[in-house]
Swiss-Prot record:
It comes from Pelotomaculum thermopropionicum (strain DSM 13744 / JCM 10971 / SI). This is Pantothenate synthetase. The gene is panC. Belongs to the pantothenate synthetase family. GO terms for cellular component: cytosol. Homodimer. It is an enzyme of class 6 (ligase). The active site is at 37 (proton donor).
């Protein structure tokens, strides 16, 4: 497995693979890999001849008081895990490689980004869309793989790729969870044992709402309130948002008559966690 630190290196690797007629699968990450990331890589491996991942903690998607500086980083560990699932190359650029002096171009997707994480993290999706556009242009994959845990991000990237006529397919992979239901996240490492226990309220509240939906409840406000009440009962939880929108349009709903996204963001201590569930059949 090759580790490339420069754009020219990873482009040369991809060019060589293409010259042999190999398809390219791409998984962009910020590193500190977990089983959710590895599942994306396995899906890429199943579908594509060559798998490239990026490991880049992107500064433009973090706000001024967020966790950019303390976001966990361990390239040696990540390379070992990626190698075990058959990744062919890692692109691990520096900030200077991606954003050289004088950089001033950004990508902004409208409408889909003005709610949920986009509302509580201003500028976040501008940073995400910019770095993903750059990575797509550098790697030029046939397929790119994103996790459903970041449901809004996956929808935004799909919209961006379609709107800008990017020549690739964006594939969303179901959320991978711990045995007790907690959605896999690199930020879970921040949680102490008591916070880790408290964090289960996210997945359990989604499951409770899912049960009510399957039992026939279609009133979006009642389902939302059910989740809010359950999370508020957890002393360590501080709610950022709990919302229900049509899926994939992300339009407000009163009654759920088709697929709907129940999405939430909750702070456990200082750690912001997100999770979601799709209500209704896709």
């Amino acid at each position: 497995m090759l580790v490339c630190n420069t754009i020219s290196e990873i482009r040369a690797f991809v060019r060589e693979a293409r010259s042999k007629g190999r398809s390219i699968g791409f998984v962009p990450t910020m590193g500190y890999l977990h089983e959710g990331h590895l599942e994306l890589m396995r899906r890429a491996k199943e579908r594509c001849d060559t798998v490239v991942i990026s490991i880049f903690v992107n500064p433009t998607q973090f706000g001024p008081n967020e966790d950019y500086d303390r976001y966990p980083r361990d390239l040696e560990r990540d390379a070992r895990l990626a190698g075990q699932v058959g990744v062919d190359a890692i692109f691990n650029p520096s900030v200077e490689e991606m954003y050289p002096a004088g950089y001033c171009t950004y990508v902004d997707v409208e409408r889909l980004t003005g709610k949920l994480c986009g509302l509580s993290r201003p500028g976040h999706f501008r940073g995400v869309c910019t770095v993903v556009t750059k990575l797509f242009n550098i790697v030029k994959p046939d397929y790119a793989f994103f996790g459903q845990k970041d449901a809004q991000q996956a929808l935004v990237i799909k919209r961006m790729a379609a709107d800008l006529n990017m020549d690739l397919e964006v594939i969303t992979v179901p959320t991978v969870r711990e045995a007790d239901g907690l959605a896999m996240s690199s930020r879970n490492v921040y949680l102490d044992p008591e916070q880790r226990r408290a964090a289960l309220v996210l997945s359990r509240s989604l499951e409770k709402a899912g049960e009510a939906f399957r039992a026939g409840e279609r009133d979006a406000s009642k389902l939302r309130q059910m989740v809010l009440d359950m999370i508020k009962a957890e002393p360590l939880a501080n709610i950022d948002y709990v919302e229900i929108y049509s899926y994939p349009e992300l339009e407000p709903l009163d009654q759920i008559n088709g697929p709907a996204l129940l999405a939430l963001a909750v702070k456990i201590g200082q750690t912001r966690l997100i999770d979601n569930a799709i209500l209704g059949q896709l």
